[in-house]
Swiss-Prot record:
The lineage of its organism: Bacteria, Pseudomonadati, Pseudomonadota, Betaproteobacteria, Burkholderiales. Pathway: Isoprenoid biosynthesis; isopentenyl diphosphate biosynthesis via DXP pathway; isopentenyl diphosphate from 1-deoxy-D-xylulose 5-phosphate: step 3/6. GO terms for biological process: isopentenyl diphosphate biosynthetic process, methylerythritol 4-phosphate pathway; terpenoid biosynthetic process. It comes from Polaromonas sp. (strain JS666 / ATCC BAA-500). Belongs to the GHMP kinase family. IspE subfamily. Its EC number is 2.7.1.148. This is 4-diphosphocytidyl-2-C-methyl-D-erythritol kinase.
Length: 309
């Protein structure tokens, strides 16, 4: 069973609002990820197709008039169909996003953030970045403030390379260090996502000498020219060979997908992997994963639940 996005609920008729509940923060999958170069400052240049899926965290925001920013873990390990809850770090990206927006807008208002964390950490699914983006969008409404779009994108990029994507409203072709975002259309599709229990460090992957950093530049036109089902098999993930060497369970999870006659690929810097679920394969045909791996049958979203905010 997949946790789907729900419509946010606002409380309070006067500005600013008193609270906004049930704010979704969807995960992403990288359909491919190419490293095309490296800047003088050490940042890697990439090309990727980012796709939103219906595996979501949920955030709740309650206004504080004392200017303080607080946060609570509302994850319930016993929620049916949702699996084990993800623990929150001491200071997550949602809190950092709230503080950054508060400073940028000069508001004296604060917020209490409740976070139901479901997207796995160290998965390459952008959970923390998505939380930050949803926080930026919701707090502009809660506090009655608005940053110009260019300033909001710059603030988002300062929080993390994936955060601007989650502000873009839908699937996207992403280039540079994450700041060049072009909307793309993708056909509706279902996927199996597998997250082995082990995670790994993103810096360890990018610092590996054997990482391929010179993949030929692709084009959106070349990507879109593929037949409908083939866009989900375009290119490769340049991080995957290094990640598999550092984290053997990634290879094991890919082998498991292959045993189900599914072509798997790692998303982002891992350790989650995914495969397209053909239309003629019933969900009940996909068995559970070994041990404490997490598995979800997900659908891609045609738009971010907060598109237009």
């Amino acid at each position: 069973m997949t946790r789907t996005a729900s419509a946010p609920r606002s409380v309070g008729s006067a500005r600013p609002l008193k609270a906004i509940y049930d704010v979704p923060a969807p995960a992403k999958l990288n359909l491919f990820l190419h490293i095309t170069g490296r800047r003088a400052d050490g940042y890697h240049l990439l090309q990727s197709a980012f796709m939103l899926i219906d595996w979501c965290d949920t955030l709740h925001f309650e206004l504080r008039t004392d200017g303080q920013i607080s946060r609570a873990d509302l994850s319930d390990p016993g929620s049916p169909g949702c699996g084990a809850a993800e623990p929150l770090p001491a200071e997550d990206l949602a809190v950092r996003a709230a503080r950054a927006l508060q400073a940028a807008c000069g508001t004296s208002l604060g917020v209490h953030i409740g976070l139901e964390k479901r997207i796995p950490s160290q998965a390459g699914m952008g959970g923390g970045s998505s939380d930050a983006a949803s926080c930026l969008l919701a707090l502009q409404r809660l506090w009655g403030v608005t940053l110009p779009a260019t300033e909001l994108r710059a603030l988002a990029l300062s929080l993390g390379a994936d955060v601007p994507f989650f502000l873009s409203g839908g699937h996207a072709w992403v280039e540079g260090i994450g700041e060049k975002i072009t909307p793309i259309a993708l056909p509706a599709a279902r996927f199996v996502v597998v997250k082995p229990s082990a995670g790994l460090s993103t810096p360890a992957i990018f610092s590996a000498p054997e990482l391929k950093r010179d993949t030929e530049t692709a084009t959106i036109q070349g990507f879109a020219a593929n037949a409908e089902g083939q866009v989900f098999g375009f290119g490769r993930n340049d991080l995957q060979p290094v990640a598999q060497a550092l984290c053997p369970p990634i290879g094991q999870s890919l082998d498991w997908l292959s045993a189900q006659h599914l072509q798997g690929r790692m998303t982002g810097s891992g350790s989650a992997v995914f495969a397209l679920l053909p239309h003629d394969v019933d969900l009940s045909d996909v068995p559970g994963t070994p041990g404490d791996w997490k598995i979800r049958k997900c659908s891609n979203l045609q738009a971010h639940p907060l598109a237009g905010w």
